[in-house]
Amino acid sequence: MSRLCIFLIQIYRKYISPLKRPSCRFHPTCSAYSMAAYERYGFFKGTYLTLKRILKCHPFHPGGYDPLR
């Protein structure tokens, strides 16, 4: 399942992301963070970390440097 998620993120980064203006307030970007989470922790924890990160991505959060731990 992790490989499928990584594949879908790669599709997003290659075809959808270039059509949008840059809007991620974090470094690394949410998609890069998610790919790293799936590669490092597998499907379940990777999904948990991805959802947690995406829920922080809103105008009221300061963003900034937020590496995968």
Curated annotation (Swiss-Prot):
InterPro entries assigned to the protein according to its UniProt record, in alphabetical order: Membr_insert_effic_factor_YidD
SMART domains per UniProt: Haemolytic (SM01234)
Entry keyword set: Cell membrane, Membrane
One Gene Ontology cellular component: plasma membrane
Subcellular localization: Cell membrane
Membrane topology (UniProt): Peripheral membrane protein
NCBIfam families: membrane protein insertion efficiency factor YidD (TIGR00278)
Protein name (database record): Putative membrane protein insertion efficiency factor
